[in-house]
Amino acid sequence: RLSGTEYPQEVVLSGSHIDTVVNGGNLDGQFGALAAWLAIDWLKTQYGAPLRTVEVVAMAEEEGSRFPYVFWGSKNIFGLANPDDVRNICDAKGNSFVDAMKACGFTLPNAPLTPRQDIKAFVELHIEQGCVLESNGQSIGVVNAIVGQRRYTVTLNGESNHAGTTPMGYRRDTVYAFSRICHQSVEKAKRMGDPLVLTFGKVETRP
């Protein structure tokens, strides 16, 4: 954090998240957090103290890939994270959110944090994670908004029976039902057009 010389009460925040999605790239998130630190260090060396306060931030559990909760870091900045929402959640291995925080040296607050009112701007460097820039022969893009996330867990209940002897007309096959739901949902998303995106990210069948 570098304090501003003329407008110390106004903060330019820069950074990114340090978690990534399952099978994500090495540069997802972490690149932006490290780049912010390097940029501020270089700017201080070249130009001295900034006019406005500049602060680097690294946020965790933004993606929701480990725990069923997204934007934990950024929600806390704006006082939108309710500790009760994560107090009893666990990852796929049974590790609790609270224990994971403790392992990193943090404790879960008892109540939502006070939202910050000093942020003047937020600057983040991030890889595209897509193909639009490359397809258009562009090396960099500037955006002022990103997609929001909605995640749903859908349970389809069918009937388990012998796969080799149950006639097709007697089956209540949830995999077949899911395949139809998946196909129709994706086709509807295509008809609605950009910037809407839709993904079925995880499918489990039992038995």
Features from the language model and the residues they span:
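Beta-strand segments within the central parallel beta-sheet cores of soluble alpha/beta enzyme folds
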Residues: 13-15, 49-60, 195-202
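Structured catalytic/translocation cores of nucleotide/phosphate-coupled proteins
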Residues: 1-3, 12-15, 30, 152-153, ...
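Midchain, well-structured core segments that form catalytic/ion-binding scaffolds
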Residues: 61-62, 66-207
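Extracellular/periplasmic catalytic domains that process cell-envelope and extracellular macromolecules
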Residues: 6-7, 49-50, 116-117
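Short beta-turn/strand-loop junction motif enriched in small, turn-promoting residues
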Residues: 3, 42-45, 186, 205-206
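A generic, well-ordered mixed alpha/beta core segment in the N-terminal half of proteins
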Residues: 20-90
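Acidic/His- and Gly-rich active-site-bordering loop/insert found
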Residues: 1-25, 43
